[in-house]
Amino acid sequence: MKLTGLLFAAALLGACTQPAAEENYTRHVDPKIGTGGHGHVFVGANVPFGLVQVGPTSIPQTWDWCSGYHASDSTVIGFSHTHLSGTGIGDLFDVTVMPVTGDVTYARGTEDDPTSGLWSYADRTQEIARPGYYSVPLTRYGIRAELTATARVGLHRYTFPASDAA
């Protein structure tokens, strides 16, 4: 009887221990791998097997921009939900959303004439990319863009400067 009581007490004490902390493997992920050269990988917010791939779209220069993003380019003409990675060919003519302040010029614009369209430079030194989250400041408008994604939904949050033009 004493042995049964001891075994019961030992089992009870064993059940009271804390579970081991789970390893956060997402800290090992670098979403920018393949965004330069001929990688054709987009940077943005997505999850494995998700229906949306939310990210920035740059002014395309050559076929290396077919994912919408290239590491060598800091232009942004908008943010969209359906980027493709590694395809080598342009995707589905994405509908883009571009947050702006001040007067609006309804055109894509060019790098040669910064006021010719909606685009902005992105401050890549402050760009944050991690699984399910993307953030970058748009220097032309003083806006911080933040994107996140779940399996079926992409969400945008824009932080505008305190201004009457915002």
Residue locations for each model-derived region?
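Sec-dependent signal peptide recognition
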Residues: 1-9
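Accessory carbohydrate-recognition regions in carbohydrate-active enzymes
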Residues: 20-166
